[in-house]
């Protein structure tokens, strides 16, 4: 017969075995993640959560994976749980700040990053990310200080050099400039790190008006980037053509509701002047700028998945209402140009503004942009030209069919004669004129696009004709464009 002591020892052993098993599984999940075996790590993370293993590392790492997969809301919940379990885990504040930034919640993102810095003052990446958020909020001098600190703490942090290279440049920046152009900075750098450095060098040389040298680094950067993120033009083309065919199908009987919200869609190519346009329109206090948000395509896909049981307009408005209660919104997901037919046919009280500029200025701006995600074609001048022409062709078809619904906004004319062009736009929108539309640089909204610095300055025409400084580099794009009769004059 076993005594009470034996029973207690047996219980202790079971608990010890259970604890040992728990940490064995957790460590296995963490090791798989560290080795880049994400699908296998995911299975173990999910198992750990199902078993109730309250280890902050599980919640944190699982959240990071989901963020990278675009599952932002679930990722936010997991990272917050990690912070709850271990309030002094600095990486969780960094990751939560990045997630909140993706969600457009810049103020809370700033607080998270300041908390990370409070916990770990020498955390270079936290200073870098704080700088990015401050830049989006228009606090450019403070952003610069954060970038300086990041470089001071970690002189080989390549993304910090790119970020600071997008701000105003002066003689005070000589120290980090020398580091940026040193041979040592490229030692043992990944391809991604090299891309950051080459783009940063190109930006500085551009500011110094050394355009030939800037061209060399732009080509190095984009060639490497294209290897990392190849682009399939045929797949891109197929999607545009498929949606063009959808226009001919009558999806539903549209009902124009007098009291329904006003939905303004800004479409065109990236770097076409759309951020300036959105800043102008959102000077109206009754307008909410949704920014670059892909909720129209999400609504369309949900409509298709529901086998047409739901209405596209209802799905879209439902998503808008989660963002704002204001009655007028701008949606600046530029690739909605592919959906211009569906917008015109299916979204009540919708207006489309097609923003465009000189194709070579647009292509140069794309090639210089260094987008962190999407827009893979921007690393190839040939693909930039092809996509530009395809976008123009698609929009001409939609304009012929929905002429009254689509406004043409020429960026070059806008910045050359803002008073005339903005008054014309506001009149087309049916709004009363306010002089504040002429001062979009005073708009206090957060801007998370590549134009976040330029748009903080008064309207100017400095970028018009900038392509001429890069004429030799742009020859591949020029050859594609001039196959179209419309652009033959560019050769002269």
Task: Label each PLM-derived region with a short phrase.
Residues 294-295, 357-362, 414-415:
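Conserved nucleotide-binding/hydrolysis micro-motifs of P-loop NTPases
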Residues 165, 177-189, 198-264, 311-325, ...:
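PAPS-dependent sulfotransferases, especially Golgi type II membrane carbohydrate sulfotransferases
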């Amino acid at each position: 017969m076993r005594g009470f002591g034996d029973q207690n020892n047996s219980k202790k052993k079971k608990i010890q075995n259970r604890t040992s098993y728990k940490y064995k599984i957790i460590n296995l999940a963490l090791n798989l993640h560290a080795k880049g075996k994400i699908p296998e790590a995911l299975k173990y993370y999910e198992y750990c959560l199902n078993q109730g293993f309250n280890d902050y590392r599980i919640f944190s790492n699982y959240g990071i994976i989901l963020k990278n997969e675009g599952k932002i809301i679930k990722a936010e919940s997991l990272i917050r749980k990690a912070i709850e379990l271990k309030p002094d885990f600095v990486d969780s504040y960094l990751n939560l700040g990045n997630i909140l930034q993706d969600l457009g919640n810049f103020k809370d993102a700033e607080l998270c990053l300041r908390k990370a810095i409070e916990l770990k003052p020498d955390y270079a990446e936290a200073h870098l990310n704080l700088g990015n958020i401050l830049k989006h909020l228009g606090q450019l001098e403070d952003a610069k200080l954060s970038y300086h600190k990041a470089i001071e703490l970690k002189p080989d942090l390549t993304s910090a050099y790119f970020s600071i290279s997008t701000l105003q440049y002066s003689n005070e920046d000589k120290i980090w400039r020398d580091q940026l152009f040193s041979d040592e900075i490229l030692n043992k750098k990944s391809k991604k790190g090299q891309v950051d450095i080459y783009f940063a060098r190109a930006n500085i040389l551009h500011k110094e008006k050394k355009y030939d040298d800037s061209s060399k680094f732009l080509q190095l950067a984009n060639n490497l980037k294209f290897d990392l993120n190849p682009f399939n033009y045929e797949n891109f083309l197929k999607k545009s053509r498929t949606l063009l065919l959808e226009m001919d199908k009558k999806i539903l009987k549209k009902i124009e509701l007098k009291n329904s919200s006003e939905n303004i869609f800004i479409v065109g190519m990236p770097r076409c002047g759309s951020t300036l346009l959105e800043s102008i329109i959102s000077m109206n206090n009754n307008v909410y700028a949704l920014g670059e948000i892909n909720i129209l395509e999400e609504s369309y896909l949900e409509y298709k998945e529901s086998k047409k049981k739901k209405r596209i307009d209802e799905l879209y408005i439902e998503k808008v209402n989660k963002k704002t209660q204001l009655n007028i919104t701008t949606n600046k997901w530029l690739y909605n140009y592919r959906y211009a037919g569906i917008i015109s046919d299916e979204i009540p009280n919708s207006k489309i503004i097609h923003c465009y500029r000189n194709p070579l200025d647009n292509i140069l701006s794309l090639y210089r942009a260094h987008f962190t995600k999407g827009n893979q074609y921007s690393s190839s001048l040939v693909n930039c030209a092809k996509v530009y022409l395809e976008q123009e062709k698609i929009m001409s078809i939609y304009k012929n069919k929905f002429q009254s619904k689509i406004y043409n906004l020429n960026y070059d004319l806008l910045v050359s004669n803002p008073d005339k062009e903005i008054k014309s736009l506001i009149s087309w929108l049916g709004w009363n004129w306010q002089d504040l539309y002429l001062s979009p640089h005073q708009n206090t909204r957060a801007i998370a696009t590549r134009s976040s610095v330029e748009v903080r300055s008064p309207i100017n025409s400095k970028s018009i004709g900038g392509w001429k400084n890069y004429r030799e580099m742009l020859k591949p794009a020029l050859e594609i464009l001039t196959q179209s009769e419309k652009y033959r004059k560019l050769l002269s």
